[in-house]
């Protein structure tokens, strides 16, 4: 008898082991993950030579020593609806990770149930349809009551849930990096609009100076015409000039209004609480880039960090999809009381205990698991390719913005020389007027070329400031990848 029981136990063990080993669906096709760009590929072309400088610092705008700009950016970062939306995406990603993690933990629930039923005289429980109190049967109506604790645990031996949780945590880390990218975009957007407005204020001042010079010329020519000393052609020429300047003044004032309204929307100001922006001089800008990019660029660009985490999350999703091919094990248990008579429910004899280990073997699924794995792998490879292109685009941004800024610096040096040359001519005209060699009109009009060249210099300075902010943004704006969020 004992030998027979041992034989049966051995047979069951052999069959169970064989089923465990072979009891999984066949992975028909799974391509390898695409390669990510290597750090040595993250560099500028050899023929691009730019000035060397350090990486931008956090809160880079404070180095510009402009209280107005600082207040605008602080207000934007504290009240932006776009940033609030990004932070809500963080919370959503965190809740999704918590939800998946909770599903892999021990689940315990209290259970209470009443079941009023009529037992069929022709069913499996037909004997209980009789009314025989002596036998403990008072059918056909019964009220079954059940109370107790129900527990379940998925053992997750192959990491289906574990990989899914890791993917959700990766998505949460990506959301954190995306929030930093939104903050960077908002700060740089405010700074660019702010300095565009400052440049417009300075342009308006130069145009008004030009208007005053030409207005003097108009009055001088008008006086000469009135005294018969000059034909009307110079007068009408000066009138055309002043009208052209007036047109430019109107355009610049309109541009100031447009920029202010764009800034109002970006900082989240209402119709009556937009802070007054006073004119200030444009700042000196940093024109260099770090000596090397490589890993540093990946760690300092929040958008690249977000993409990297999405890639990692996609690889974890592939691991989860592969684990679905293997057997899954779970354990369910119940401990409580069950009785078909309410008055006996809480008696010792009503105790019930169930222990239910379970095994699920994916043998034939019509290709569902393979289709899921193939789609998940394709999505992961797409994310890797998108990441690779994003890295190349980031290097391109640094190269293009750095080159543009260096070109603007060279142009500014030449334009500064032109301004100085016209100023020399103006000073010569004023000296000639002081010696009585030329008229006051000629000395005054000598100011016009200087103003024109100063406008050109202002436009270059404005573009340099905007371009330097764009370069700073392409270098990450002081962002550094911090500690990652891990499973609690």
Swiss-Prot record:
Lipidation (S-diacylglycerol cysteine): 24
UniProt keyword annotation of Cytoplasm present: no
Protein name: Multidrug resistance outer membrane protein MdtP
Gene Ontology BP annotations: response to antibiotic; transmembrane transport
GO molecular function list: efflux transmembrane transporter activity; transmembrane transporter activity
One cellular component term from this protein's GO annotations in UniProt: membrane
Location in or out of the cell: Cell outer membrane
PANTHER family for this protein: MULTIDRUG RESISTANCE OUTER MEMBRANE PROTEIN MDTP-RELATED, OUTER MEMBRANE CATION EFFLUX PROTEIN
Stated family: Belongs to the outer membrane factor (OMF) (TC 1.B.17) family.
Disulfide bonds, paired cysteine numbers: none
Self-association state and partner proteins as the record states: Could be part of a tripartite efflux system composed of MdtN, MdtO and MdtP.
Record-linked NCBIfam families: outer_NodT, PRK09915.1
Matches recorded under SUPFAM superfamilies: Outer membrane efflux proteins (OEP)
Purpose: Could be involved in resistance to puromycin, acriflavine and tetraphenylarsonium chloride.
Membrane-related topology note: Lipid-anchor
Keyword terms of this UniProt record: Antibiotic resistance, Cell outer membrane, Lipoprotein, Membrane, Palmitate, Signal, Transmembrane, Transmembrane beta strand
Endpoints of the signal sequence: 1-23
Taxon lineage: Bacteria, Pseudomonadati, Pseudomonadota, Gammaproteobacteria, Enterobacterales
Pfam families to which the protein is assigned, alphabetical: OEP
Source organism of the structure: Escherichia coli (strain K12)
Lineage: superkingdom: Bacteria
Residues carrying lipid (N-palmitoyl cysteine): 24
């Amino acid at each position: 008898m004992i030998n027979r029981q041992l034989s049966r136990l051995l047979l069951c063990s052999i069959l169970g082991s064989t089923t465990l080993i072979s009891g999984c669906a066949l992975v028909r096709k799974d391509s390898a993950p695409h390669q990510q760009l290597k750090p040595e590929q993250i560099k500028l072309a050899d023929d691009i030579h730019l000035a060397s400088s350090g990486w931008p610092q956090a809160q880079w705008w404070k180095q510009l020593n402009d209280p107005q700009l600082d207040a605008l950016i602080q207000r934007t970062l504290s009240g932006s609806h776009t940033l609030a939306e990004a932070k809500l995406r963080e919370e959503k990603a965190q809740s999704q990770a918590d939800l998946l993690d909770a599903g892999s933990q021990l689940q315990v629930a209290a259970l209470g149930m009443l079941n009023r039923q009529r037992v069929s005289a022709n069913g499996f429980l037909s004997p209980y349809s009789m009314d025989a109190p002596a036998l403990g049967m008072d059918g056909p109506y019964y009220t079954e009551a059940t109370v107790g604790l129900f527990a379940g645990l998925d053992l997750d031996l192959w990491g289906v849930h574990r990989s899914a949780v890791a993917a959700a945590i990766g998505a949460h880390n990506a959301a954190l990096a995306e929030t930093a990218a939104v903050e960077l975009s908002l700060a740089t957007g405010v700074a660019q609009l702010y300095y565009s407005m400052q440049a417009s204020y300075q342009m308006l001042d130069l145009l008004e100076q030009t208007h005053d010079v030409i207005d003097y010329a108009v009055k001088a020519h008008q006086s000469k015409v009135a005294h018969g000393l000059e034909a009307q052609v110079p007068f009408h020429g000066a009138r055309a000039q002043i009208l052209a300047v007036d047109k430019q003044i109107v355009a610049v004032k309109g541009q100031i209004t447009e920029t202010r309204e764009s800034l109002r929307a970006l900082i989240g100001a209402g119709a009556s609480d937009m802070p007054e922006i006073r004119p200030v001089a444009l700042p000196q800008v940093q024109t260099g880039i770090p000596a090397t990019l490589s890993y540093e660029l990946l760690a300092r660009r929040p958008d690249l960090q977000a993409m990297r985490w999405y890639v990692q999350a996609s690889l974890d999703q592939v691991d989860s999809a592969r684990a679905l091919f293997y057997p899954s094990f779970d354990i369910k248990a119940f401990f409580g009381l069950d009785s078909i008579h309410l008055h006996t429910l809480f008696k010792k004899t009503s105790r019930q205990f169930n222990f239910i280990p379970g095994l699920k073997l994916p043998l034939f699924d019509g290709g569902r698991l393979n289709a899921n794995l193939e789609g998940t792998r394709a999505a992961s490879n797409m994310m890797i390719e998108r990441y690779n292109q994003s890295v190349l685009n980031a290097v391109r941004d640094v190269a293009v913005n750095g080159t543009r800024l260096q070109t603007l610096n060279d142009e500014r040096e030449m334009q500064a020389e032109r301004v100085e040359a016209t100023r020399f001519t103006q000073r010569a005209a004023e000296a000639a007027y002081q010696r009585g060699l030329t008229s006051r009109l000629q000395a005054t009009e000598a100011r016009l070329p200087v103003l024109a060249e100063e406008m050109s210099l202002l436009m270059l300075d404005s573009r340099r400031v905007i371009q330097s902010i764009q370069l700073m943004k392409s270098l990450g704006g002081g962002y550094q990848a911090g500690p990652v969020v891990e499973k609690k």
